[in-house]
Amino acid sequence: MGTLWSASANLEKKFHNLVLELHLSYINSGADVIITNTFSARRIRLIQNKVNEHFKYINEQACLLAIKAKNQSKKNILIAGSLPSQRDTYVEDKRKSNEIEKDFLDQASIISPYIDFFYLDVLSSGKEIDIASNVATKLNKPILVGAHIKKNCLLASGETITEVVEKYRNENWLGLIGACISPEIVEKSIDELREINLPFGFKANLWKIDEPGPQQTFNTAKFNEVGTNPNIAFGKRDKYTAKLFYEFSEKIIKKGATIIGGCCETKPEHIREISKLK
């Protein structure tokens, strides 16, 4: 359905078990944290796909399914609320601050009662990180910052991680990670991350290209069209095995990282391997 992607599974009850089973597959592989399926439930995506009237339901169901998975697993995991960029992914949101704040608050207010902390999910500018952090603080929730870093080790806004931390640091931050970035970019940026005086780490993706962006064809589908699979638009690294992911993660942990995980194209077997590093 257009650009709705994973949020379709929250909307249609026949797919709820898919979300539940996916959460459980990661929990049973050793994940300490699962993230609500709200990345594609941002309002702009629902407007584009003509389902904005279901905004509350789609976001609520994502949270309820995460809680159901936790309860079924009987494991003491945490639930992070995915609070994504409120426009396109991987690029800076250049709108006025009050417009960005309203969108963050609308989504965060629905998610907040169900979660342990907010995960700022792949944000691309200090301004967005600051606005989202202030929204989460108003809702009395801790925050894990997920900053998307490019090959030049800058955010899409042109800021360094150091600049973002120095200008916008919030007392409710649990830490800061490189979000949805390749293992190679993690390795390039890790020396700067280790100097920010916060818990740090990564959620690495296994896309074939280093710098994904909304210009790729998968994000242009109309509401009544089937979009290109991101695996085709971005490619995937089938040969990046769980063992390679373990070796990469071990190297980053030795640099001081304490928050590690997988993003797009990482699978339960990748998490199972890195869970051995606890």
Predicted regions and their residues:
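Domain-level signal for soluble alpha/beta catalytic cores
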Residues: M1-K278
